């Protein structure tokens, strides 16, 4: 059973930015238990402080690039609950700001390992807990950078490609689990003022100054992003399985 008959969430990448905002909003809801992952829990100071005043928040160690780490994290969760209802993979990196011609193998591989294999590792490790849950929801935080029809003439190379691969993976999983009552979706979180966003804007500013200023002026807070995405996830239905959603709840093309 889920914890005390309530809803159990696993938020992967719950130690900062959007993930931390998800943890905070969810943990303020009655009957919700949240497992928040961090690659290095010892340095996740804000998450640790939050958990001290919210007994329904449990911190787990998880490095998504390692299947062994993902399985260990699932074992940590299983010591507390017998199933989970929502698995939300929010972790990711964006460090690729050069054209394809100049992007190194290391960058291609690191983005694929974290943004694609990472979510796969987590799904494989937590599947047995999800299939016993009530909701059976899997959510992947994706990006509009994955949309082929919406690609801008800027240099997201490895990042955009990895998010497109993530969306393909989401769609494949949605087909595989449909008969078992799962609802699997990807969501674009919006342009969010996180550490990753600030770094990206700094890298792109010299080449695309006008575009960067426009993007920065429209950026929203992690709290706004988390709240809007939760409105989507809180209302997921069977027919939403396999969909890619924008922050406002509209469907996005792949």
Swiss-Prot record:
GO terms for biological process: cellular detoxification of aldehyde. InterPro entries: Fungal_SecMetab_SDRs (IPR051468), NAD(P)-bd_dom_sf (IPR036291), SDR_fam (IPR002347). Its main location: cytoplasm. It is found in: Cytoplasm; Nucleus. Its EC number is 1.-.-.-. The active site is at 159 (proton donor), 163 (lowers pka of active site tyr). NADP(+) binds at residues 18, 37, 63, 90, 159, 163, 192, 194. Pfam families: adh_short. GO terms for molecular function: oxidoreductase activity. SUPFAM superfamilies: NAD(P)-binding Rossmann-fold domains (SSF51735). It comes from the Eukaryota. One of its GO terms (cellular component) is cytoplasm. Keywords: Cytoplasm, NADP, Nucleus, Oxidoreductase. This is Uncharacterized oxidoreductase C24B10.20. It comes from Schizosaccharomyces pombe (strain 972 / ATCC 24843). The lineage of its organism: Eukaryota, Fungi, Dikarya, Ascomycota, Taphrinomycotina.
